[in-house]
Amino acid sequence: MKQSVGHRIFLLSPAYAGGERARMILRGQAQFPLARQLRGKSGAPIADVFTFLSGLYFRGKIAYAKAFARAPRGTSGVLVITPTRGLIDARTRIHLDDLREFAEVDIHENDPRYRMPIDRDARLLGKKLSDQSEVILLGSIATGKYVDVLLANFGQRLRFPADFVGRGDMSRGGLMLRCAADLQELSYLPVAGAIVNGKRPPKLAPRRYTGHFASGD
């Protein structure tokens, strides 16, 4: 049975697993803490790994989503889109082999290695949510790689932050980190029919963070 009250679930676009920072962490001789975690038996949370790979953008996404998610009982409110594993809880621990697998697949809406798992998970999630619930995509809506499969499963429930329009990744990351620290939630627009290009907003003023916002934890 669907929930009778609205919930808010966040879907975070993934960090690129084929770049230089990924190669750093995949090197067998890497000795920094996160690399050792990935090689260890317990692995490392995917949120920590993607924050390392992506920097400010993913750090902002995870902080923002944690601050404002409202999930049904038994469902994670913060899910990460992956190249091959569908939607997974941001707390899920991964290992080096998982990261290597992600690096082998460039996300494209027509690649079944990506499309089939995310379609499966989005369909299951959609059944748990009421029509009043919102699924917030913290990622690009300018191409079909995320939007096509998610819109097919969530319809009008799929939304994105209005303030993303006109901003690049770094600006979006800084904005979300600031909003999470101030507990000021952004407004959202339906993805269906959205205008994806707009005037670039003013540059954010520099800001220092303390505590867990300083490290992205």
Specify the residue positions occupied by each region the protein language model found.
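Peripheral peptide segments
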Residues: 1-217
